[in-house]
Amino acid sequence: MKQVNGEKLLASLGDGVKDIRGRITPDAPMDRVTWFRAGGLAELMFQPHDIDDLVAFLKILPEEVPLTVVGVGSNILVRDGGIPGVVLRLSAKGFGFVELAGENRILAGAICPDKHVAAMAMDNGIGGFHFFYGIPGGIGGAARMNAGANGVETRERLIEVHAVDRKGDKHVLSNAEMGYSYRHSTASTDLIFTSVLFEGYPEERAQIRAEMDAVRNHRETVQPVREKTGGSTFKNPAGHSAWKLIDEAGCRGLVIGGAQMSSLHCNFMINMGQATGYDLEYLGEQVRREVFEKDGIKLEWEIKRLGVFMPGREVRPFHGVTSE
């Protein structure tokens, strides 16, 4: 369903937008942004030129206008009805940097790919970042959800997060203030992460290269890295592996519409070509149902679902009652 509200929303922001240097796009297709390559339109998409431009935009954005932040699009599923309000997509030019910030320290912009941080660390003999080479996505998302791989989590290397709130005020959050747990932080969802400071330890480059090669080889062997996918679909329940539960429930390779649970790694949902947001979310909820009926375990989404459903194409979330 094509939205027609973007121009109206842009006009409502008044003359203040004339001073904005970033790109403002009404009715922006989200299927060009997400790694799933599916979903509806963003009513208005804003890509700030830099942090000052971001602050200026936030100060003219009315409080009642919804604001949704997306990173590189690797861990989100956008519904077919699109995303009302403003979608904030940080630009690579202003937020994609990675640089040294002192002995064994690295500062990375929120949109910087995780693997670029791993590469910077290796080039400078800084250990502890090899796991980032196996995580698809950007540093802001990794900091937000405490992303991890190969037994290492983001919180183990993170010193502080730099952020801006909805009013345009700047904040710095320490590791402790992030309130980390497994694939979660308690940081306010109103905060927009702009950069992250990390600290590693001295390590030989050859050793780091070997660790990164092992991560890459493992990922390419067991994950559908060349498919349209958002990464791990569900969190691992305590004491269990999500992929194993999905496999035991008979959902490996399960297809709904244009969406499939990967036959290579069944905790990865893939767009086989023409999947809609509805197909993907319906498939995920069906897997949650099948796993619960088999093992009594309720899987939690790791993929974020954003936006609104198309009328008549709503997906009912499974709440753990088999009679639903």
UniProtKB/Swiss-Prot annotation:
Query: Per its UniProt record, what InterPro entries does this chain match?
Result: FAD-bd_PCMH, FAD-bd_PCMH-like_sf, FAD-bd_PCMH_sub1, FAD-bd_PCMH_sub2, MurB, MurB_C, MurB_C_sf, Oxid_FAD_bind_N
Give the pathway. Answer: Cell wall biogenesis; peptidoglycan biosynthesis
One Gene Ontology term of the molecular function aspect = UDP-N-acetylmuramate dehydrogenase activity
Q: GO CC terms on record?
A: cytosol
Task: Give the cofactors, semicolon-separated.
Answer: FAD
Q: Specify the FAD-binding PCMH-type domain's residue ranges.
A: 36-203
Which SUPFAM superfamilies does the annotation name?
FAD-binding/transporter-associated domain-like, Uridine diphospho-N-Acetylenolpyruvylglucosamine reductase, MurB, C-terminal domain
Q: What is its EC number?
A: 1.3.1.98
| Top-level EC class as recorded in UniProt | oxidoreductase
Give the primary localization class: cytoplasm
Q: Active site located where?
A: 183, 232, 302
Keywords associated with the record: Cell cycle, Cell division, Cell shape, Cell wall biogenesis/degradation, Cytoplasm, FAD, Flavoprotein, NADP, Oxidoreductase, Peptidoglycan synthesis
Domain of life, per lineage:
Bacteria
Entry coiled-coil feature ranges: none
- Name a Pfam family for this protein: FAD_binding_4
Swiss-Prot/TrEMBL catalytic activity: UDP-N-acetyl-alpha-D-muramate + NADP(+) = UDP-N-acetyl-3-O-(1-carboxyvinyl)-alpha-D-glucosamine + NADPH + H(+)
Compartment annotation:
Cytoplasm
Q: What is the annotated role of this protein in its UniProt record?
A: Cell wall formation.
Tell me its family: Belongs to the MurB family.
What is the recorded name of this protein?
A: UDP-N-acetylenolpyruvoylglucosamine reductase
The organism's taxonomy opens as: Bacteria, Pseudomonadati, Pseudomonadota, Alphaproteobacteria, Hyphomicrobiales
Q: Which gene encodes it?
A: murB
